[in-house]
C-alpha cells in the first residue's frame, strides 16, 4: 500500500484530517494532522442566544495517539523511515483542498501560481509575478479570489492622515488547479486571526 494511502486511512480512522506528509533528509517522516471541520449548513436555523464555543486545537495527546497507530501501520507495511513526527498545523498551514479554502475564507493567505499571471495582470501588477498575499474571498463566479492593497501598513506610532486617499484594492481570481502552493499567511496576532488585508509580497 502506498505511503499516502496508509497515512490517510490511519489518520482518518482515528477521527482526524491529514494536512500534509513530508519526507526529509535523514529519514524523518513528518505528518501534520488537524481536527475535522464541517462547513456550516446553509439555511440551518442558528441560535443567536447560544455563545460560540472556543476553537478546538490538536493536543499533544492527539499527536501521541496518531503516532502510536502510525508506527504500527507503517511497520506492518514495511515503510522505511528513521523517525516519525506527528504535529498540528503551524501558523502557515497549507491549503490543499476545497474544504480548506471554505474553512479559512476571510483569512490572509499566501499563494504561489504555477505560471506567471501574464496577460491577466492588465498592467496592474508585474506580468511575471507568481506570488501574492491577500484576503481569501469567494468570487462572484463561484471560484476563489484574494483581495489586497499595495499600500504599506502604517508603522507603529505613525499617524495616518484622515485626508489620505487609501490605495485601491486589487483582486485576483484563481482556481485550485492554478496553484503551486497556498498557505495561511504567517501573521502573529495575539488578538487572534481575523479577516484583514495585508500587503502583497514581491
UniProtKB/Swiss-Prot annotation:
A GO-annotated cellular component: cytosol
Cellular localization per UniProt: Cytoplasm
Keywords: Cytoplasm, Ribosome biogenesis
Protein name: Ribosome maturation factor RimP
NCBIfam families in UniProt: PRK00092.2-1, PRK14642.1
Function: Required for maturation of 30S ribosomal subunits.
PANTHER family recorded: RIBOSOME MATURATION FACTOR RIMP (PTHR33867:SF1)
A Pfam family annotated for this UniProt entry: RimP_N
One Gene Ontology term from the biological process aspect of the record: ribosomal small subunit assembly
Family label: Belongs to the RimP family.
Keyword Magnesium (UniProt): no
Record-linked InterPro entries: Ribosome_maturation_RimP, RimP_C, RimP_C_sf, RimP_N, RimP_N_sf
